[in-house]
Curated annotation (Swiss-Prot):
UniProt-listed HAMAP family: IF_1
Name used for this protein in its record: Translation initiation factor IF-1
Family: Belongs to the IF-1 family.
Organism of origin: Xanthomonas campestris pv. campestris (strain ATCC 33913 / DSM 3586 / NCPPB 528 / LMG 568 / P 25)
Compartments where found: Cytoplasm
Statement: the UniProt record of this protein carries the keyword rRNA-binding: yes
Amino acid sequence: MSKDDSIEFEGSVSETLPNTTFRVKLENGYEIIAHISGRMRKNYIRILTGDRVKVEMTPYDLTKGRITYRMK
């Protein structure tokens, strides 16, 4: 799968789960489970409940995603 196959959505973090995993409510109303991308983990970017985030998802599993950006 290439990087072009991923789907990007915006949403807000509704709940913090263990192991840097979050429940994210997307703009279209769906809730998914998302983890932090490696680059965000490496740069110690903190994500809290209520933060606006950009989530990258694969078309094969639309219930899980990767948080790639935290909005300011």
